From Swiss-Prot:
It comes from Vibrio anguillarum (strain ATCC 68554 / 775) (Listonella anguillarum). Pathway: Siderophore biosynthesis; anguibactin biosynthesis. The keyword Hydrolase applies. It holds the Pfam family Thioesterase. Probable thioesterase. Involved in anguibactin production, but is not essential for virulence or iron transport gene expression. Belongs to the thioesterase family. This is Probable anguibactin biosynthesis thioesterase AngT. Its EC number is 3.1.2.-. One of its GO terms (biological process) is lipid biosynthetic process. Transmembrane segments: none annotated. It is an enzyme of class 3 (hydrolase). InterPro entries: AB_hydrolase_fold (IPR029058), TEII (IPR012223), Thioesterase (IPR001031). The gene is angT.
Length: 252
């Protein structure tokens, strides 16, 4: 079964633009349930499901962003939508996966319609909240504080063996994704890219996200939206308008 889960689609699918969501660490399709209610116009929305959760609960977890990117590429190549009609929307850890997938596709001569990098500091900037070495209790406490975990999980340690493996794998992957040197101009990603920051996001601020311009040669804009770190799941209509803005920019 494909790890790409279709969330919503318009009735007309010929030459539809495909928006593929790459979730944050610990995220699954359920986190994007409100995206299913969006009204679309010749558009398809899918979400990438990482190993170790939902119907992939028995799949081995992955602790490498590049491996997750390769998995996404294979899913894109085998789905019914054309890669040149696809915009990948990566949020937090998902932005790292999206960027790596975009870069690998370019190296294969395949060019996406666009890339959106949301809520994620640039690859040469270390995250301010590192959880990989925390004990389970501290790890869960931090997830609740960020807003990426149901508070009830902190009071239900009997569920931890089920949820923690995927959560810890994701955080290991994202925390290991750090580069000590910057790319040169020729190495910058040559596809249209939109940056998005949340005005109340404490995990990745505007200046840290702005630094992606050193990695992407065709940044068309850097939008600031209302919300904390999880604006992508809390305000799907607003995010859809941001995506459409990039889609229009690349079509013009």
């Amino acid at each position: 079964m494909s790890p790409l889960i279709k969330l919503a689609a318009s009735s007309r699918l010929h030459d539809a633009t495909h928006y593929v969501l790459c979730p944050f660490a610990g995220g699954g399709s359920g986190a994007f349930r409100h995206w299913r209610t969006l009204s679309l116009e010749n558009e398809v929305i899918s979400v990438m499901l990482y190993p170790g959760r939902e119907f992939r609960i028995d799949d081995p977890t992955v602790i490498n962003i590049g491996t997750l990117a390769e998995e996404m590429i294979q899913a894109l190549k085998t789905c019914n939508q054309r890669i040149e009609d696809t915009i990948i929307v990566g949020h937090s850890m998902g932005a790292q996966v999206a960027y790596e997938a975009s870069k690998k596709l370019v190296n294969q001569g395949l060019f996406l319609k666009g890339l959106i990098i949301s809520g994620c500091q640039a690859p040469h900037i270390k995250g301010r909240r590192l959880l990989g070495e925390c004990d389970d209790k501290t790890f869960i406490h931090n997830l609740v504080e960020i807003g990426g975990c149901d508070p009830s999980l902190a009071k239900s340690p009997e569920w931890w063996p089920i949820f923690l493996p995927a959560l810890r794998a994701d955080f290991t992957a994202t925390e290991q994704y750090i580069f000590t040197s910057l790319p040169n101009d020729k190495e910058g990603l040559p596809i249209p890219t939109l940056l998005i920051s949340g005005d109340q996001d404490r995990e990745a601020n505007f200046s840290e996200i702005e630094e992606w311009k050193l990695w992407c040669n065709k940044v068309v804009d850097h939008l600031v939206v209302e919300g904390g770190h999880f604006y992508i799941t809390e305000q799907p209509q607003m995010m859809l308008e941001c995506i459409r803005a990039l889609s229009t920019e690349t079509t013009a």
